[in-house]
Amino acid sequence: MAKRKDNKTLAENRKARHDYFVDEAMEAGIALVGTEVKSIRNGRVNLKDCYADINNGEIFINNMHISPYEQGNIFNVDPLRKRKLLLHKSEIQRLIGIVQQQGVALIPLSLYLKNGRVKVNLGVCRGKKNYDKRDTMLEKAHKREMDRQLKERNRY
């Protein structure tokens, strides 16, 4: 029987792309407990306001809320606990060098399944100023208007 491809996006941090410039994105595994995986597969995860930080050469995700699994009575853990990211040592060293720069943060962009395992798309991000956000919204509005006019023009 052939392996099935299940690269299903489970959660996305849309606010991250609005609040930050994403310089680079990388895939990382995440250490979870069984009931957390079941809860994530049910879509009961929230990436809003979560971030990653580095402690003693290891990378952890903070403020990622995974709701307790309904049938997982004593095996449920704290919904906001720190969760370790699984990366190669060379990747961690490179990220340490990048994060030491001023104004750079590690932000989880999305959570997805890859071959039955939960993976995190981790972004190396720089914060946007308010005028950058306005410029982005203005560009989107102009593009939307141009597309609308092209559609009207090509309709007949």
Swiss-Prot record:
InterPro entries: SmpB, SsrA-bd_prot, SsrA-bd_prot_CS. GO terms for cellular component: cytosol. GO terms for molecular function: RNA binding. GO terms for biological process: trans-translation. Keywords: Cytoplasm, RNA-binding. It is found in: Cytoplasm. Belongs to the SmpB family. Required for rescue of stalled ribosomes mediated by trans-translation. Binds to transfer-messenger RNA (tmRNA), required for stable association of tmRNA with ribosomes. tmRNA and SmpB together mimic tRNA shape, replacing the anticodon stem-loop with SmpB. tmRNA is encoded by the ssrA gene; the 2 termini fold to resemble tRNA(Ala) and it encodes a 'tag peptide', a short internal open reading frame. During trans-translation Ala-aminoacylated tmRNA acts like a tRNA, entering the A-site of stalled ribosomes, displacing the stalled mRNA. This is SsrA-binding protein. It comes from Clostridium perfringens (strain 13 / Type A). The gene is smpB.
